[in-house]
């Protein structure tokens, strides 16, 4: 995987209250590209953070339907990945994951 693809796969951290609780169990949540696969996400995290990844779980979040002045509209959906690191590995520079 080339360096350019690494930065296109991981779009950024997804920080929520649920993600903060998951970080306590060595699981970190990232927003990822719609076409990203589990092996790509694993390689991207290992290349970017230099940590060993134990597993990756991926899910698609559907956009919400919202009413507008002109009828119904649809918000954009996204894809997120729960990345579990190997035992003893943590991401210190992961903001908000204390």
UniProtKB/Swiss-Prot annotation:
Gene3D superfamilies: 3.30.70.330
Similarity section: Belongs to the universal ribosomal protein uL23 family.
Role played: One of the early assembly proteins it binds 23S rRNA. One of the proteins that surrounds the polypeptide exit tunnel on the outside of the ribosome. Forms the main docking site for trigger factor binding to the ribosome.
UniProt subunit comment: Part of the 50S ribosomal subunit. Contacts protein L29, and trigger factor when it is bound to the ribosome.
UniProt entry tagged with the keyword Magnesium: no
Protein name, entry field: Large ribosomal subunit protein uL23
Source superkingdom: Bacteria
Listed GO biological process terms: translation
Keywords carried by this UniProt record: Ribonucleoprotein, Ribosomal protein, RNA-binding, rRNA-binding
Keyword Protein biosynthesis tagged: no
GO cellular component, one term: ribonucleoprotein complex
InterPro entries found in the cross-reference section: Nucleotide-bd_a/b_plait_sf, Ribosomal_uL23-like, Ribosomal_uL23/eL15/eS24_sf, Ribosomal_uL23_CS
Transmembrane segments annotated in the record for this chain: none
One Pfam match: Ribosomal_L23
GO molecular function (one): structural constituent of ribosome
